[in-house]
Amino acid sequence: MTVKQTVEISNKLGMHARPAMKLFELMQNYDAEVLLRNDEGTVAEANSVIALLMLDSAKGRQIEIEANGPQEVEALAAVIALFNAGFDED
């Protein structure tokens, strides 16, 4: 089963190196594949910092998060919490 949710980027600088690293590090704790899709359809695996940077998503943009795997629900909740916290940057 796959779980999905859309979130809005709330941190001032959007998806840049620091948030990408935080997300990458967070994903190491979960047995799940997590994909992020921006509003232009670009997809990035959450376990790839380079792919996350390619999302080129600024503050206010929508990101769809999709998780699949044994810990998909937990992984999705953790990613949503990180986005909602503005990656602890603000």
Swiss-Prot record:
One Pfam entry name: PTS-HPr
GO BP, one annotated term: phosphoenolpyruvate-dependent sugar phosphotransferase system
Start and end residues of each HPr domain: 2-90
SUPFAM superfamilies the UniProt entry points to: HPr-like
Superkingdom of this protein's organism: Bacteria
An example Gene Ontology CC term for this record: cytoplasm
Positions annotated as active site in the UniProt record: H16
Keywords per UniProt: Cytoplasm, Phosphotransferase system
Location within or outside the cell: Cytoplasm
Record function comment: Component of the phosphoenolpyruvate-dependent nitrogen-metabolic phosphotransferase system (nitrogen-metabolic PTS), that seems to be involved in regulating nitrogen metabolism. The phosphoryl group from phosphoenolpyruvate (PEP) is transferred to the phosphoryl carrier protein NPr by enzyme I-Ntr. Phospho-NPr then transfers it to EIIA-Ntr. Could function in the transcriptional regulation of sigma-54 dependent operons in conjunction with the NPr (PtsO) and EIIA-Ntr (PtsN) proteins.
PANTHER family: PHOSPHOCARRIER PROTEIN HPR (PTHR33705), PHOSPHOCARRIER PROTEIN NPR (PTHR33705:SF2)
Record-stated family: Belongs to the HPr family.
Name of this chain's protein: Phosphocarrier protein NPr
Organism: Klebsiella oxytoca
